[in-house]
Structures are given as structure tokens and as C-alpha cells.
Amino acid sequence: MEYNVPRQSSLRMVSVIAKWYCYNVPKTFTFLNLIGDFKSWNDVSHGMLWAYNLNYMDWLLQPDMTFEQGSEWVERFITDLPTNRIGLDPYPIALRSINWIKFIGRHHKKVESNRLQRWNDSLYAQCKLLERKLEYQLLGNHLLEDAYALFIASIYFSDKKMYDKASCLLYKELDEQILPDGSHYEQSPMYHCILLDRLLDCYNASINRGHEKMCELLKLYVVRMLGHLESIVWKDDTIPLLNDSAYGIAPTVSELRAYAKRLKLEWTPLPMKECGYRKLCSTHLEAVVDVGNITATYQPGHSHADTFNYELRIDCRPFVVDTGISTYNKTARRQYERSTSAHNTVTVGNKDSSEVWGGFRMGKRAKVRVLSDTENEIMAEHDGFKGCIHQRKFTINDDVFTINDKIVGNNMTECISYIHFAPDIEVLAISSTEIRTNRANISVSGANSIEIINDFVSVEYNRLEPSKTIKIVFCRNLTYQIFQA
């Protein structure tokens, strides 16, 4: 093997973020809220994403993982690798490579030279395979993760050729994927946090090996991503669950802040612009609204047909919520969770505002034009429905959140506005002009009918909670106001 890792200088990094508890002795794993005993690295009985999580080996970095336990699993992985089809996919290689390097760094004083040599031989071979299988067919976060892994591995192995290639790819992908307002172009707050974590890892590795030019470049994007995170998070430091986002996967905002501070970074909030999201706030109300186009135009796999969707919190507690995501399996549930009716916006003729299909595919997309944008009000329109334009105005004043919808055009098809409540919201009374709940009231003008339907929301994978959804049928114009009871 052509690499150089001096025994005394395995990659030292400032303390990284510990991973979620997934492994339980002797061989039980919990991923995506699904528990299973280890059978093989290729076990897809819980779905492909579960098998991928097993092969990422994030769990080597969970707080209670001992060196002895982790070593046994690394050895087992190396032994089983010739028959491990899933583990040799490029995305698991990328994530696992970083985790192995962190694990070795954490326990470098305990790793015997013969064992380290065996681990390094396997790790280097895996990274060279990744180098040949970069995910240009998927692009997006997958290719960026590939670049992260090769960059960190190139520093660990002191491999200049790999470093030059990884640095070039990393710069190209960061320049393309991180928008000027600091957001990741796939518009998922969850993936933003995941990618920020490993970008911090890259910066961490770089500063500890004195790569000054690359350090400055990485710092630029890290600070930008931190600035966006400060702008989009709720007051309680949780993320909005927009597009493909769920809790229990990415590092928390507080963990990311603490990691950045350990790296002596400083940042300030950046105004949201290119991401398409906006924040409207008053004393008791906090709303995040979506008035953006699909920014990852060639890779919208994590995007939903959610134009003009919003989430609303009252006194930091969820009131109107996105229905979230519970699965990546190509099922009817996955199709619904990406559909327009699963979001707090309008359908015309029971159609989606953008075409979603195949679990991660998107066809024709709505095109958005922002008409006005101020601190307390934003108005935009989109052309996602055939024969008409949907205009929506969001306004927040004196703890009243107002939504005005207008359908412009010759299309007289039935329009439906959906409002999805958080699971703990109870509908106390309903009429043609008012909806009363245990936390707030909604006054409605322009409705032909209002109906309560039973629904589910998901804040974590494979966990559906019963909830109520309001379905408002209208013709051309609808206004509703949300205010505290």
C-alpha cells in the first residue's frame, strides 16, 4: 500500500460530535426507530436505509462505545468485506471512512501497530475504491460526502495525489451546493446539519495539519452554513421539518454550535434569501414559510411539492406542522409525504403543485415569483397548476398570522387549503367561519366548506403520530387568520 501514516501521528482532531446511541450489547442495533439483531452487513429486512446505517458505522462514535467493542466490529467488518455488497457502495464507504478515522484518533494510544496496519490497509483500499466510484450519477449531498471523506482520508494517509483530487472536488461542490445565504441547495434543514457536521470535520482535520489555504476556504463555507442555521432554527434550537427532514438523525443545533466554538469559529446569522425560506415573528408567534423554487434543479430527490408551505409555532410549541417524513421506501406513504396535500398549502383540482414520483423523483416543477418581501409580510405566486396562478400572502401583525390565497385564471376547478395540526392540538369546535382549538383559534373567510380529517404526522423515521388536519374547500379567494385563544 502506498501511504504514510506515522505510528505516532495518527490524525489528531479537536473533540468531534458524538453520535446517537444505536448499538446495544451484544449485537443489537436501532436505526430509524427499528430494532434488529445483527445478521449480516447485507441485511435489508428493515429496508435499505437501515442496512446503510449499519454500514456507516456511526455507532463507533456513540458515547459508551469502548475500544474493545469497537475493535471487534472493525475486525469483523474487514473479515466480512469480500461478501459485503452494501458496504462497498460509495456512500457507506464515505461515511464509514470518516468514522473509522475518528475512532482511531479517539483511541490512538490503544491501537497496536499490527492492528493499525491491518485497519489502515483496509481503509486505504476502501478509499481508493471510493475514488473510482464517485457518485456523479447522484450528485448532491452524496457527491459532497464523497469529497469530505476523500479529503479527510488524504490528510490521514498523507496522500498528496488524493489530497489534490479531493480538494478540487470539495471546492467545486461547496461552491455549487452552498448558496450565498449559507443554505444547502437541497433545502432540507436536516441535511444542512448533517453536511455542516462533516464540513466542520474537514476544517478540524485541516487546521491540525496546517493546510492554511484550504483552511481559509473551508472556514468561509463553515461560517456561512452556521449563519444560515442561526436564521432558520426555531427559538428552542430545533430545526423546521421541511422537505426531507426528521429529528434523531443529524447532530443537534447545540452540538454543532459547541463543536464550532471548540474550533474557535465566530459567526453571525445570515438573512435567508436563496434558500427560499423566510421567518416571520411576533412576540408569541414564529413562522417559517416557503416561497422558493427548487434550487437543486437536477437533483430534487429530497424536495417535496410544498410550494407556499409553512410551519407555525405559538410560544415555542408546534401548532401548524409539516407532516414530515417517516420513510424513504418507495411506498404510498412516501408518495403522500412528498405530495402537496401533505403540506400547509393549496391544491387545485386535487393536483400537486410539482410532479413527485418514484420516491426521489420530480417532474414538472412550480416556478415561484416573489412579489413583495418585508419583515412582517411576504407575497408570492407560482404557476404549478395548469390554467391558473396561485398567489399567497403571509402576514404577521400583533400576534395574528394571516394567510391570503388567490387563484387567478380561467380554471374553475375546486381548490383545497390544508392545515396540518401538531399531534397535541385538539379541535374544539368548527363552523363555516371559525376553527377553535385548545391552543389557538382560526377565523376563515371565503370557505365553501371546512372539514376535519384524521391524519398522521412524523417527526422521526418510522414513527407516525395521530393528528388532525383541516381541509378548507374554496373557489378563488380564501383568507384565514390564526391567533391565540
Predicted regions mapped to residue ranges:
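Residues that flank catalytic or metal-binding motifs in active/ligand-binding sites
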Residues: 55, 146, 276, 306-308, ...
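Short acidic-hydrophobic surface loop/beta-edge motif
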Residues: 29, 278-282, 310-312, 426, ...
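Aromatic-lined, polymer-binding surfaces characteristic
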Residues: 47-222
